[in-house]
Amino acid sequence: MLTIGVLGLQGAVREHIRSIEACGAAGKVIKWPEELKEIDGLILPGGESTTMRRLIDTYQFMKPLQEFAASGKPVFGTCAGLIILAKNIAGTNDAHLGVLDVTVERNSFGRQVDSFEADLTVKGLEGPFTGVFIRAPHILEAGADVEVLSEHNGRIVAAKQGNLLGCSFHPELTDDHRMTKLFVEMVEKHKREAVV
């Protein structure tokens, strides 16, 4: 059985575990860097990116997370997790993991009072997907190797590059598990190809 980890430092960790399990994989909360060896794929959940970065540094996760992504194992960043994955963050020179070739803008849809839901067309999913946006970032620019999966009002809100997946919204906060399933399928494919 596939095991997908959720970085358990902050954010909607339980909700991601529930969604992973609904897709038929095992979910594991990752609290320590050495636990990354036990998983086939990793979700970086939403939360607050500055706080998450501080916790990543405190618990010495930065290098192990970069090595995990460099190994080719799939990583999915949602909301703040997208910011953590991004190569560039608008208005600052301080990227985090810097592995997904995008430039993101934080809180680009407004403050928490401006949180909203929107029906999205997501490449690879049949029918609309309800995106829950909470102080969400969006992708300002995507590199040549980045596939745009979804836009909302002309703003990129989901993208994929190799085994990296990122979205501005919180797919774990709905009962529609198709975004998580998309990631589970990426992990399955990677694990299959790694064995060959």
From Swiss-Prot:
Catalytic residues as annotated in Swiss-Prot or TrEMBL: C79, H170, E172
Keyword entries, A-Z: Glutamine amidotransferase, Hydrolase, Lyase, Pyridoxal phosphate
Pathway entry: Cofactor biosynthesis; pyridoxal 5'-phosphate biosynthesis
UniProt xrefs under SUPFAM superfamilies: Class I glutamine amidotransferase-like
GO cellular component: cytosol; glutaminase complex
CDD domains from the UniProt entry: GATase1_PB (cd01749)
Family the entry assigns: Belongs to the glutaminase PdxT/SNO family.
Name recorded for this polypeptide: Pyridoxal 5'-phosphate synthase subunit PdxT
Native organism: Bacillus licheniformis (strain ATCC 14580 / DSM 13 / JCM 2505 / CCUG 7422 / NBRC 12200 / NCIMB 9375 / NCTC 10341 / NRRL NRS-1264 / Gibson 46)
Gene name as annotated: pdxT
